[in-house]
């Protein structure tokens, strides 16, 4: 009985597609709602989240792959080993690791960076490329900041040990700085425009 209903469903699907009905391609998630996904983020450390159990769309009705599908396929084909991206993507890691596994791909290592924060009205908010001109690199060139100064300031935001290194290595080129993901802020550095000036 189960077999005949599946065959009937497949025939209905085939007829609908052949009839021109729009369709999407979804992942049939092998996830278990009672199991956890464990991974080691290169900045945030060990993270535990529920496994993905959602049958997510991989190809949209226009034939364009979703970010999730493109991430797994493109990074596999390009032999990407490490992915650095904003921490708003942490919630997607269980799905992404699941996609790598079901596709038979070696998973990448993730480093999720916290957004740069800005003080506003007594609180903090994420620096926004839509609302804040200082979020664009071109802004600093337009207002006359030397590139070297901007690079130095950005390194103070990215690595907590940069200022100590600079004091000890006043004449060293920035390329000598031993950048370390473990020294990045897990909660988001505060952008201080006054300090830059």
Question: What is the meaning of each model-derived region?
Answer:
Residues 1-8, 12-15:
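Single conserved hydrophobic/aromatic residue that forms the stacking wall/gate
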Residues 9-10, 50-53, 134-135, 196:
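Short acidic (Asp/Glu) patches
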Residues 13-19, 23-26, 32-69, 95, ...:
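Non-catalytic beta-strand/loop surface segments
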Residues 67, 78-86:
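A short, conserved beta-strand element enriched in hydrophobic/aromatic residues
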Residues 71, 83-85, 130-133:
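Residue-level structural signal for beta-strand termini and adjacent loop
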Residues 86-92:
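Active-site beta-loop-alpha junctions of metal-dependent nucleic acid enzymes
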Residues 102-197:
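Catalytic adenosine-cofactor/nucleotide-binding cores of aminoacyl-tRNA synthetases and other
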């Amino acid at each position: 009985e189960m077999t005949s209903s599946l065959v009937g469903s497949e025939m209905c699907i085939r007829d609908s597609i052949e009839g021109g009905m729009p369709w999407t391609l979804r992942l049939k998630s092998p996830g278990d709602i009672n199991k956890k996904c464990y991974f080691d983020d290169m900045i945030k450390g060990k993270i535990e989240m529920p496994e993905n159990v959602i049958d997510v769309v991989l190809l949209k009705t226009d034939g364009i792959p979703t970010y999730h599908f493109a991430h797994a396929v493109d990074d596999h084909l390009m032999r990407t080993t490490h992915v650095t991206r904003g921490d708003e993507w942490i919630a997607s890691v269980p799905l992404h690791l699941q996609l790598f596994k079901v596709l038979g791909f070696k998973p990448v290592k993730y480093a999720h960076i916290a957004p740069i924060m800005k003080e506003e009205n007594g609180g903090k908010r994420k620096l926004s490329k839509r609302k804040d001109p200082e979020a664009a690199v071109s802004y600093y060139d337009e207002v006359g900041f030397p590139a070297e100064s901007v690079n130095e300031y950005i390194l103070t935001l990215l690595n907590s040990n940069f200022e100590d290194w600079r004091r000890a290595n006043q004449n060293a080129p920035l390329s000598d700085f031993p950048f370390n993901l473990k020294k990045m802020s897990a909660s988001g550095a505060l952008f201080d425009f006054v300090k830059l000036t």
